[in-house]
Swiss-Prot record:
TPR repeats: 25-58, 135-168, 197-230, 293-326
Lineage, uppermost ranks: Eukaryota, Metazoa, Chordata, Craniata, Vertebrata
Protein's name according to its UniProt entry: Prolyl 3-hydroxylase 1
Organism: Rattus norvegicus (Rat)
GO molecular function: iron ion binding; L-ascorbic acid binding; procollagen-proline 3-dioxygenase activity
InterPro entries according to UniProt: Leprecan_dom, Oxoglu/Fe-dep_dioxygenase_dom, P3H, Pro_4_hyd_alph, Pro_4_hyd_alph_FE2OG_OXY, TPR-like_helical_dom_sf
Domain Fe2OG dioxygenase per the UniProt entry, residue ranges: 556-670
Residues carrying a glycan: 308, 450, 459, 532
PTM comment: O-glycosylated; chondroitin sulfate.
Length: 728
């Protein structure tokens, strides 16, 4: 932690202005808004830029001073006073102890006063601080920059404001307009207020979700390093004046030790809240859950996927510091240990900075819970990993009673709402069913394809199972293509699954298969068949769901999963856990957050099975709780499952416990802007390699009983949803 504190101090020194030449940001902001009102655009730029720099410089000054004074004047123990118990019998020694304690405190305060100087008087009001946090200066700046023809800066300011205010429709329109202007480049759309730790984390998670563990690792490691620096900065900035919460100072009355307690507990609570602050991003409604531990979760699996078992064990052990009873992580650790060897694995310890962080955090929580229990000063623990023994027994019982009361009231309200909903549903169900039936059940287009299960049979909406999409010979040829591509060195390289260490997978994308075919490493006709089959599935799904807008490929790959024989004993995990394809599923809260790193633009999904000669691997739909199974589908050659990608269709894949499961997984979007670039390249390559008659798919053959209105009993699909994992 010493190195981290030094890094925080050096960053603050670099960011701060020399000496005390820092203007008041509130005055500069006021001058900027006044300039905006009179149309003085250079004045807006001058004052708003200075206001932003001034606020940043004040923050850096406070951070530098508090870090430096804490380093130069630490709280040193009184080594020459003997054991603390002896102070009870020696009033003189106790008084001396107090004097030394307060002497250190006074010296720290004097250090801060000298360091901070006159700028310490610049305190923003709560309202103005909120304006800066909302990034309001950038709203003014983007207009002013545009007016004085500084387009690059206008774009950056607009983007910075929009990141913090994603619901601001006018700014969205401005950004759309900027995108159409000549001279505007993609790199101009940058967030000037981006936090390094969050930027690296989101980039690392995106690469991880795209199954690029080698590229993800450096960003996730950088995110961790930046996190600890940001944490030290946040904690140092908590040591400000006491917040009386409105007009409470008028009635505040406390003796010396109560006043010290109140202020210190407030500071500790602020420091604990850094967990929430650092896990927050302006574009998200809620902070990332278990933000710091999640870094180690991503890293342990990323390291595992690139074959670095030493680091995988270190990160797994670090994660288990926070969640020691996590069964999946314990299972992963046991697997890594078996591969690396018990002796070498036992010498690997959790990361030291994480151990220090956890130890310090638990000590702070103990004090805060003690203050909650004795003085009634509320403390809301931001972490889910806090051990129960840290909380005093009496407080545990009180919280348990409060939770039970809240649950009872919630259940009563819920029951009442269900009664009302049932009445409403009964009134609307009939009309809804008719509406769904009129949408789902379009022609299947090709002879031989049969409708096996519709939404009604699958107990949901916007779901379908079809058989006969391809023949047995085509299934076998595509399976051979996957294995041939794997041995030729494709993008997957025969790695273990990104979702479970108990399976290996081999896969190839359409473009990669065509390129391998062009190079003679796999049969070119097989690669062409793969291309045609994916287009066939796209057309069928588009027709069956009666979509008014064309479906575009978002991502597609042919993948085979093989059970690792020695890893199947007492296996409890899934081949792919329950998820949603275009949002991040929080099963406990029954919500799905549609924001990055989820692939929010995905609208429909499909999976075409190539075989069924394996154990396990069944596909299943669930409710939002990820536990209540609503339908299950057993794979077989030529069987396709299609569904909308939204919250109405959470799904997962059961563990493959024997053999190899092969399938083509496809995701589609209704937005052409998110059409897969690889697909466009694949289209061009097919046109170059094959004659026009070879490129065309077999003639679509509408079947008489599949045209017109759907048959009674057929239902439709409605919404869409998804998750940041390219697996079905």
């Amino acid at each position: 932690m010493v190195a981290v504190a030094a890094a925080a101090a050096s960053r603050a020194t670099a960011e701060s202005e020399p000496e005390w030449n820092v203007a008041a940001p509130d005055l500069l902001y006021a001058e900027g808004t006044a300039a905006y009102a009179r149309g003085d655009w250079p004045g807006v730029v001058l004052n708003m830029e200075r206001a932003l720099r001034s606020r940043a410089a004040l923050r850096a000054l406070r951070l530098r001073c508090r870090t430096r004074c804490a380093t130069e004047l630490p709280w040193a123990p009184d080594l020459d006073l003997g054991p603390a118990s002896s102070l009870n019998h020696d009033p003189g020694a106790a008084a001396l102890h107090d004097l030394r304690f307060f002497g250190a405190l006074l010296r720290r305060a004097a250090c801060l006063r000298r360091c901070l100087g006159p700028p310490s008087a610049h305190l923003l009001s709560e309202e103005l601080d909120l304006e800066f946090n909302k990034r309001s200066p950038y709203n003014y700046l983007q207009v002013a920059y545009f007016k004085i023809n500084k387009l690059e800066k206008a774009v950056a300011a607009a983007h910075t404001f929009f990141v913090g205010n994603p619901e601001h429709m006018e700014m969205r329109q401005n950004l759309d307009y900027y995108q159409t202007m000549s001279g505007v480049k993609e790199e101009d759309f940058k967030d000037l207020e981006a936090k390094p730790h969050m930027h690296e984390f989101r980039l690392g998670v995106r690469l991880y979700s795209e199954e690029k563990p080698l590229e993800a690792v450096p960003h996730l490691e950088a995110a961790l390093q930046e996190y600890f620096v940001a944490d030290e900065e946040c904690r140092a900035l908590c040591e400000g004046p006491y917040d009386y919460d409105g007009y409470n100072y008028l009635d505040y009355s406390a003796d010396l030790f109560q006043a010290i307690t109140d202020h210190y507990v407030q500071v500790l609570s602020c420091k604990q809240n850094c967990v929430t602050e650092l896990a927050s991003h302006p574009s998200r409604e809620k902070p990332f859950e278990d933000f710091l531990p999640s870094h180690y979760n991503y890293l342990q699996f990323a390291y595992y996927n690139i074959g670095n078992y030493t680091q995988a064990i270190e990160c797994a052990k670090t994660y288990l510091l926070f969640f020691p009873n996590d069964e999946v992580m314990s299972q992963n650790l046991a697997y890594y240990t078996a591969v690396l060897g018990e002796e070498e694995a036992s010498s690997i310890s959790p990361r030291e900075n994480a151990q220090e962080y956890r130890h310090r955090s638990l000590l702070e929580k103990e004090l805060l819970f003690f203050a909650y229990d004795i003085f009634g000063i509320p403390f809301v623990d931001p972490d889910s990993w806090t051990p129960e023994e840290v909380i005093p027994k009496r407080l545990q019982e009180k919280q348990k009673s409060e939770r039970e009361t809240a649950v009872r009231i919630s259940q009563e309200i819920g029951n009442l709402m269900k009664e009302i909903e049932t009445l409403v549903e009964e009134k609307t169900k009939e009309s809804l069913d008719v509406s769904r039936l009129t949408r789902e059940g379009g022609p299947l287009l090709y002879e031989g394809i049969n409708l096996t299960m519709n939404s009604k049979v699958l107990n949901g909406s916007q779901r379908v199972v079809m058989d006969g999409v391809i023949s047995d010979d085509e299934c076998q040829e595509l399976q051979r293509l996957t294995n041939a591509a794997a041995t030729s060195g494709d993008g997957y390289r025969g790695q273990t699954s990104p979702h479970t260490p108990n399976e290996k997978f081999y896969g190839v994308t359409v473009l990669k298969a065509l390129k391998l075919g062009q190079e003679g490493k796999v049969p070119l006709q097989s690669a062409h068949m793969y291309y045609n089959v994916t287009e066939k599935v796209r057309r069928v799904m588009e027709s069956y769901f009666r979509l008014d807008t064309p479906l575009y490929f978002s991502y597609s790959h042919l993948v085979c999963r093989t059970a690792i024989e020695e890893s199947q004993a007492e296996r409890k995990d899934s081949s792919h856990p329950v998820h949603v394809d275009n949002c991040i599923l929080n099963a406990e809260s029954l919500v799905c957050i549609k924001e990055p790193p989820a692939y929010t633009f995905r609208d429909y999904s499909a999976i075409l099975y190539l075989n069924g000669d394996f154990d396990g691997g069944n596909f299943y739909f669930t409710e939002l709780d990820a536990k209540t199974v609503t339908a299950e589908v057993q794979p077989q050659c030529g069987r396709a499952v299609g569904f909308s990608s939204g919250t109405e269709n959470p799904h997962g894949v059961k563990a493959v416990t024997r053999g190899q499961r092969c399938a083509i997984a496809l995701w589609f979007t209704l937005d052409p802007r998110h059409s897969e670039r690889d697909r466009v390249q694949a289209d061009d390559l097919v046109k170059m390699l094959f004659s026009p008659e070879e490129v065309d798919l077999p003639q679509e053959q509408p079947l008489p009983d599949q045209q017109g209105s759907p048959k009674p009993g057929e239902e439709s699909l409605s919404d869409r949803e998804s998750q940041p994992k390219d697996e079905l």
